[in-house]
Amino acid sequence: LTLERKRISQLLRNRGYYYFRPEYMEYLADTTVERRRVALRLNLKPNVPEVALKPYRVGDITVRLTNIKPGPADTFRLRDVRVIAQRPMKIRPKILSRTLSLEPGQLFTVDAQNRTQTVLNKLGIFRSVNLGVTPLDSLRGADTLDVGIDAQFDYPLEAALETDVTSKSNSFIGPGITFKVSNNNLFRGGEV
């Protein structure tokens, strides 16, 4: 029963009902209908917040890209998204555009939110990616959620040192050492 409430909640959240939660539903059981049978009914609880019963659309999207070392920032538009990036920009706009599943004006879906965050993380060039949602006040549109994406670039080089004990085919055991260096953003464009 809990899984069904979660499934319904997820369906609603993917149809714009961003604030809907499984806890807003309850089961009513009737055992008087027939012997050894239970009639279940799924209802909304009486005190569900009004914001949970309203579908939301995506409002303004702002992407803030920061480097480890602070520098001057550029602001530009990419499709309908405002991007604020510190120079030098370490990702190509085309690649950044492909990672954004949310678009202004569309119904807000949690799947698109998760997909955007996952794809940005999988690029492997960011130390952290945070996606925040801000509801607008009633003057600009009470059914709109602004999206802010904050991503901080990671160090371009990573080094790892591994030590181990190895055994050869002649039954001799000896020390082993491995030093690895990897460049997370070799061409400085965010390529995978």
Placement of each model-derived feature along the sequence:
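Short sequence motifs at beta-strands and strand-loop junctions characteristic
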Residues: 171-173
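Periplasmic polypeptide-binding modules associated with outer-membrane biogenesis and secretion
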Residues: 1-167, 176-180
